[in-house]
Design a protein with these regions (language model features):
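Chalcogenol-based redox active-site neighborhoods
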Residues: 1-156
């Protein structure tokens, strides 16, 4: 898992695709100072590849890590992937919308929205998964979960 790079630091990461992830990233960015003050780091994970995540970070002046989930490896490992049904895929393709194109793979699977609070060992202590995660993963919820972790003391 991505947080194991720095085993002494808890982290908050958010996962998703398209418009949802862009809104979630902006919300996570707004919480980043509080998350850092709690001794953790904020990470966003998107299946988008190429320059898109980097450009989004630059254009919105975001101060957090944005990582690409190539081939949905992280999302699959957490069971956070849904397969796009043929009855939805076909009309989208007829309109010229190929949801797999920005991801760099040909299969039509999308990550489910999720926000996790992980401790310094990479163990999940709070999970907000699915459509409700948009309203559940508030700054207050995340900070409350971080305050319950046994880990580094909050930064002054």
């Amino acid at each position: 898992m991505v947080c194991r790079d720095k085993p002494s630091e808890p982290c908050v990461w958010t996962n998703g695709d398209g418009l949802w992830i862009r809104g979630a990233i902006r919300a996570l960015h707004g919480s980043t100072p509080s998350i850092r003050a709690a001794g953790a780091r904020a990470i966003a994970i998107t299946p988008e590849t190429g320059d898109s995540p980097r450009n989004f970070k630059r254009d919105h002046r975001l101060d957090l890590e944005i990582l690409s989930d190539l081939d949905l490896g992280v999302s699959l490992s957490f069971g956070l992937v849904s397969v796009m049904p043929a009855e939805i895929k076909s009309p989208l393709l007829q309109r010229g919308l190929d949801l797999s194109a920005p991801h760099g793979f040909s299969f039509w699977m999308l990550p489910m929205p999720a926000t996790y609070v992980l401790d310094q060992r990479g163990i999940i202590h709070r999970a907000c998964v699915g459509p409700d995660s948009i309203t559940e993963a508030t700054t207050e919820t995340v900070l409350a979960a971080l305050s319950e972790l046994d880990g580094p003391q909050p930064r002054p």
